[in-house]
């Protein structure tokens, strides 16, 4: 290993501890931050912390542009750098933090499933011939939980038996913050059906496992498996590109369309900033405009 590579490795190790312990950031977010920072150290040829300055940031941005990275990717990398520079200053490894100006990003509005598409999607697992009834029960519970609560895929995978009550689920979100999210009667029924059948059998393979959603080996279900199951069912009902996050978008937009308060939706989604939730008001507005052009007498 070269001296510069060794320097990068040690710096990233210290940064990892800062993110995990001091900031309480989830392992996946820590990994993403560290990948972006390591790329900065490599592209800007940083061999010592005193080489980190405004010029090195400009050089990094220039190389990102040459690599034809999107503005969204660049913005994410710069956010990671801002946190990294704060860490260095706190650790007295950097006298002055370089100024970072975030690029303006055009936010693409998410493609939203209609109520009819969601209902069709929710029905898929229990209506497919020859699909193992136990797997169908689990997948139905997953789909209902996503749409009923709007939680993230990582939050669903992390759900434990003790997190579920009759009316709420306790969700551990970004920054390990917990929140209580109401759950619908149908979603609770789907979860109970799964818990009383398939999960009880699976837990025999791994008695100490406390997570709700398990693989056929009795282990905690991972994000990639959930992603594959959702896309499998989605292809049966729509040509739209659907992911677990699509059900989160549908949850928020359908609540707004039915006049739910934006602040309540923000709380249920676990957004720290209202601006993250406001994107759904634009989606709801697009839906309103579409209905106007469909039903207004002068447009018929």
Swiss-Prot record:
Any one cellular-component term (Gene Ontology)? cytoplasm
Q: Which InterPro entries match?
A: CB, DNA_brk_join_enz, Integrase-like_cat_sf, Integrase_catalytic, Integrase_recombinase_N, Integrase_SAM-like_N, Recomb_XerD, Tyrosine_recombinase_XerC/XerD
Q: Catalytic site residues?
A: 152, 174, 245, 248, 271, 280 (o-(3'-phospho-dna)-tyrosine intermediate)
- SUPFAM superfamilies reported in the protein's UniProt record: DNA breaking-rejoining enzymes, lambda integrase-like, N-terminal domain
Q: Tell me which Gene Ontology terms the entry assigns under biological process.
A: cell division; chromosome segregation; DNA recombination; DNA transposition; resolution of DNA recombination intermediates
**Has the keyword Zinc been applied to this entry?**
no
Segments crossing the lipid bilayer: none
User: What is a single molecular function from GO for this protein?
Assistant: tyrosine-based site-specific recombinase activity
Major place of residence: cytoplasm
Which cell locations does it reside in? Cytoplasm
Identify the residues that the record assigns to the Tyr recombinase domain, covering every copy.
108-293
A Pfam family of the record is Phage_integrase
Q: Which NCBIfam families does the record associate with it?
A: PRK00283.1
Its function, per the record, reads: Site-specific tyrosine recombinase, which acts by catalyzing the cutting and rejoining of the recombining DNA molecules. The XerC-XerD complex is essential to convert dimers of the bacterial chromosome into monomers to permit their segregation at cell division. It also contributes to the segregational stability of plasmids.
- Subunit-structure text: Forms a cyclic heterotetrameric complex composed of two molecules of XerC and two molecules of XerD.
Q: Which family does it belong to?
A: Belongs to the 'phage' integrase family. XerD subfamily.
What protein name does the entry list?
Answer: Tyrosine recombinase XerD
Q: Which organism is it from?
A: Chlamydia trachomatis serovar D (strain ATCC VR-885 / DSM 19411 / UW-3/Cx)
Q: Which gene encodes it?
A: xerD
């Amino acid at each position: 290993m070269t001296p510069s590579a060794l320097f990068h490795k040690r710096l990233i190790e210290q940064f990892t501890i800062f993110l995990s312990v001091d900031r309480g950031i989830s392992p996946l977010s820590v990994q993403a931050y560290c990948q972006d920072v390591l790329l900065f150290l490599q592209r800007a040829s940083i061999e010592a912390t005193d080489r980190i300055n405004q010029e090195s940031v400009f050089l990094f941005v220039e190389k990102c542009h040459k690599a034809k990275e999107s503005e969204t990717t660049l913005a994410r990398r710069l956010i990671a750098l801002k946190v990294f520079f704060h860490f260095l200053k706190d650790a007295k490894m950097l006298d002055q933090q370089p100024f970072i100006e975030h690029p303006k990003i055009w936010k693409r509005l998410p493609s939203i499933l209609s109520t009819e598409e969601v209902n069709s999607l929710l029905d898929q697992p229990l209506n497919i011939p020859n699909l193992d009834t136990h797997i169908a029960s689990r997948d139905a519970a997953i789909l209902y939980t996503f749409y009923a609560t709007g939680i993230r895929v990582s939050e669903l995978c992390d759900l434990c038996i003790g997190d579920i009550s009759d009316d709420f689920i306790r969700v551990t979100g970004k920054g390990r913050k917990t929140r209580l999210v109401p759950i619908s009667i149908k979603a609770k029924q789907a979860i109970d059906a799964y818990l009383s059948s398939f999960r009880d059998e699976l837990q025999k393979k791994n008695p100490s496992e406390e997570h709700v959603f398990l693989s056929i080996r009795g282990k905690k279900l991972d994000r990639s498996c959930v992603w594959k199951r959702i896309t499998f069912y989605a292809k049966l009902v729509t040509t739209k590109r659907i992911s677990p996050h699509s059900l989160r978008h549908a949850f928020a937009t359908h609540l707004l369309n039915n006049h739910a308060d934006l602040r309540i939706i923000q709380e249920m989604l676990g957004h720290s900033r209202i601006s993250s939730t406001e994107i759904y008001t634009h989606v709801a507005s697009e839906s309103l405009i579409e209905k106007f052009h469909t039903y207004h007498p002068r447009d018929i």
